[in-house]
Amino acid sequence: MEQKIEKALIEKYSCNTKLLVSVALFCFILIDIMNLRTIFALFVLSCTTATAQNNKPLNLTVEARGDYQYTSVDGEKDKDQSGFKGNIVDFVLKGDLSPKFSYAYRQRLNGINKDYTFFDATDWLYLKYKPTNNLSLIAGKYIVLVAGWELYPAPIDCYFLSEFCYNFPCYQWGLAGEYVTNSKKDAFVAQVCQSPYQKPYKNRTGNSADMYAYNLQWMGVHGFYESNWSVNLLEYAPNKFINYISLGNRFHFGEKVQLELDFMNRAASHQAFFGKDCSVVGQVSYQPTEKVNVFAKASYEVNKSGTDADVAVQDGTELTRIGAGVEYFPLKDKNVRVHGYYSYAFGKNTNPNGTLRDKESQVNVGVTWRVKVL
């Protein structure tokens, strides 16, 4: 009898937790209008902690990162880009609604201002339906499937990036279909989503437009080699498209060394297809112990296309960035991370609102922590 009562209680609270997730997501939209997001976020955390039981249909993690950064350009300190700064605070909510339905939600809590809507700070918010072991359908906000390993770490895990990454809004609303082979070694994904350049187009011209991106991706794991390749067609202006061919390659040399090599070619009409507008990014990582990761990275980007099609790396740009860093994980579960890195950029950036500048040095140290709430 006691076992039946216990089972009934677990089922009851499991249903309550599912209901709470739905209510929470709906209320977040309403709270955006009321401008009380932070208060509500704390409320959700307390409520989910109080109501979740042993049989949980969700997992909730809170993440935060704080840095000290010193930036200089040609030896002159950049005061706006120097000092102690909160980098990111977010929460990640994941779970299963049934054997075939799952969901995931990541919200940054430090990305809101008057020009930045609530959903701009939502990295992903999607529902996944898996009718078979091979096929999945994904609807919602999701990463834009442009390949290359540099684009794939979460923002909280990024240090110094190429100029392309800083100007590519990589989370958009859309639909995707995924096919995984029986061996589980290869996955093929087709996606249609809002163009990452829809909002930049409006900011640039003052005109609204409904623009899309069409993406095909292949990810594979074959021995010591991992692929992350894609072909992409993205609207940068109404009915005007730029094509990406992005080839991400990762090599494992034993258990302690990894090498990542990304190549991206970008081309539009009325320009040479290969080599005029491209990026090359390489990173080598080495783990001498389970608690330490040492890495070095370099990127080279050039655009000599003579067109305005590339919004991310603009015509006339030629930039190089090099750097190295170290990560230390004092805990076995790696929920606390201390990092430090140095980077140096040089070359020409024709984007007046770009990120990288000629002769820019950056020193950064910081700490990241993750707390599993549920």
What function would you assign to each model-found segment?
Residues 65-79, 115, 126, 130, ...:
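Outer-membrane beta-barrel pore domains
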Residues 162-169, 206-210, 299:
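Short, well-structured alpha-helical patches and their helix-loop capping segments
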Residues 87, 121, 133, 171, ...:
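Exposed loop/turn and edge beta-strand positions of beta-sandwich/beta-sheet ligand-binding modules
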Residues 189-240:
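Loop-centered beta-sheet repeat module
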Residues 15, 20-55:
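Bacterial Sec-dependent N-terminal signal peptides
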Residues 54-70, 80-197, 219-223:
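Outer membrane beta-barrel
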Residues 4-7, 12:
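Polybasic, lysine-rich low-complexity intrinsically disordered segments
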